[in-house]
Each structure stands twice: as C-alpha cells, then as structure tokens.
Amino acid sequence: TYYRGIEYLDIATGKFTHYNKKTVPTLESEQTWTVLDGGDENLYIGHVNSGFSILSLKDRSTKNFRHDPNDPNSLPGDEVSTILKDSYGNIWLGTDGGLALYNSTTQSFVTFKQNRNDKYGTLSTRIFCIKQLKNNKLWIASELSGITILDLKQSQFLSPEQITFEFLREGDDSRSLSNASVRYIYQDSFDNVWLGTWGGGINFISSEPALFTTIDYSPIPTNSNSLNNKIVSSICTDQQGRLWIGTDGGGINVFENNKRVAIYKKETGEL
C-alpha cells in the first residue's frame, strides 16, 4: 500500500497478515510501490522514496538499500517502481535513477546506462515496468524513452558497458509507439504484447504477421507510403518486382519495397 506497508491475503482463510512498522520495526518505510515474492522466503520491496528492502519471511529481518551518490555500486534511485525476478534468478529493479541488477553475493547493484558504442541507444533514468517475455527478452517501460529490450542471454556473459539494447520509440508510423511514456507491459496467452502509455492509449503488438497489408490513399503528394487516388482499376508486377497500380484519375503509381517510387500521368505527358 502507499501508506500502511504490505498486506498479505491468505485466500483459503480470508485473513490478512500485516507487514508494517509495528510488525517489522526495521522496515525502511511503509510507503510501497511494488512487492515481489521471490520464492526464496524473501519479499523484495520497492519503496516510494525510501529505496529497496528485502524482508525475510522466516524471522522478519530486513536488509535496506538506499541510493548513495558517492557509490556507483549503490541503488541508482530511491524510488523503486517495479521489481522482476527473471528465469535465471536475477533480481531487476526499475528506479527513478535507471535500471539496476541486484547482486545478492556482494549486496550491491549494477546500473545499466547508455551503451558507449551506441549514441542513439539511451536508457531512460525513470523505469516504470519490467517484464520478461516468452522469447527470453526483457522489456523495460520508461518515461520518455519508450521500450528498451534486453536479451537476457547477453546479460549472463557481457559487462553492462558491452551489452546492446533494442528500442521501440515514439513516431508517426505503424511501427512506432503512440507515446514515449510507457507505464505497463502485458503479454497475453497468444504472445501478443500490450503496452499502456501515459497519454497515448494502448499500443498492441501482434505476435503474428498481419493478414492484410494495405496501401492507403493520401491527399498529400509527398507521402510516398500511399496512393494518390482512391480508385484502383488494375495491378501488375514487372521483372524487377515493382508493383504497378492503375488508378481512375491518378495515373499509374509504381511501388518498390512498400514505397511509391514513381507516378505516370497523362497530364505530364508520361502516358
């Protein structure tokens, strides 16, 4: 909860167990954004502004971690919005200071930042959601940086500086996000991915190729992704694989690799 710690509901009995300052005096804060049951008799807790805690369910002892600007191996931010345990047993945290990987042996953190070899690959410093998809890739939702994708196989063998990321950014075409601020990631039973954004609605990414690909009409002459006329009367391809489309009033539109490369019209003397 936001103000009163953690509530555990036993579905069989309908009773709650409370984890707060009264029952766990060493708990760093009762303000909580997220909780993960690690399956190892520990609760992993992300606080609103008080860092990260690990609560032992055996004896209710805690380990508390805060950001230290003088320690590069400390938690990168004190606001922890999301925690994930991946299929390798790694604990990932999304904070207001970036993406972090917890090292249980050294009780320290590895922070993932921009790859020094990729000037366009910038990781946001504010992470809202982390999900492991069925293809063994980590999807990271962030503020103003869209989706960052990390292949978990990479992270087992490379240092953070060497790891490369994939990115889904905001844009105007059908292959881009409607908004750069992504708050939630969900993969359904059909392997489709749903993204909840802040201001851009829901983005849907199908696991299967579309049944139809359409070439739409646009009144903008410079739009090379579209037809210049709504009425199509004939279609054929040439030996180079280009698509020739005859229209009623727009002449002949020629497409190559899904882009319009030429228009032949009577008015211009080309037909």
Question: What are the language-model segments listed below?
Answer:
Residues T1-L271:
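Carboxylate-rich, polar loop motifs that coordinate divalent cations or form catalytic acidic clusters
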